[in-house]
Amino acid sequence: MHSIFLFIFIIINLVVVTSVRAETWVLPPHGIDIFGQIRTTQASRTETLLDIARQYDIGQIEILLANPTVDRWLPEDGAKVILPSRYIIPHAERKGLLLNLPEMRIYYFPETKQGEKPMITTYPVGIGRMDWVTPLGVSKIVEKKKDPTWIPPKSLQMDRIANGEQPYPSIVPPGPTNPLGRHAMRLSIGGGSYLIHGTIKPFGVGMRVSAGCVRMYPEDIEALFDKIPVGTQVQIVNQPIKLGWLLDSLFIELHPPLEEEEAIYADYWQMAVNAIND
């Protein structure tokens, strides 16, 4: 008999932990799609929920959805905080980097040498806003830069002016005011105009805040940067509904669809049921 389980970040086996950054897990074999473990921690009066999210390598929207009764800015001292750190691998080739836009999370499949077990690591990311959508498709890393210089695109400058904001300087040198942070990796998609990069605004990780690029916590892209060679495949997919098997149990993981596709997902629950039946 098969069992079906639904989780929207929150599923079984809550484990209390004290500190975790991005963990590397053994990649489950094909036919098993789930890895990681749901955990809990306790808030202290000196930190916000977003501080906790960064400490445990979770995005802002992820931790808010997992903890709807915990105040974002002033969590009660000792409040239990659920850390949504169990994942269904998106349905795509398990190779290189795999970004699922609705999930705002990227998966990394390191190349495996003979005799080594295949591994998987995952990181939260920020993605493009509704009017600056991060493009879907199969791409690759074509360039890597440490301490990059940033030339703001004309479209972004015009947007800032239209919103009554000061435009950026025409050239932003490396340093603490550079929005790209200290690391940038250029994608082939979109004529090379999209980057995976760090940020000087880490609270935007796990949100739709960019002009189409992919933002990572500074410490995450620093850890990833030297592991990713030029030529690494990057898949960008749109899967708000994910299905995954663990032994004889089918799990379904739901994420809010991208705002521009809300009409398509108007009957979200029925689509989830249809996905199971298919």
Annotate each PLM feature:
Residues 56, 60, 67-71, 85, ...:
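Sec/Tat-exported extracytoplasmic proteins
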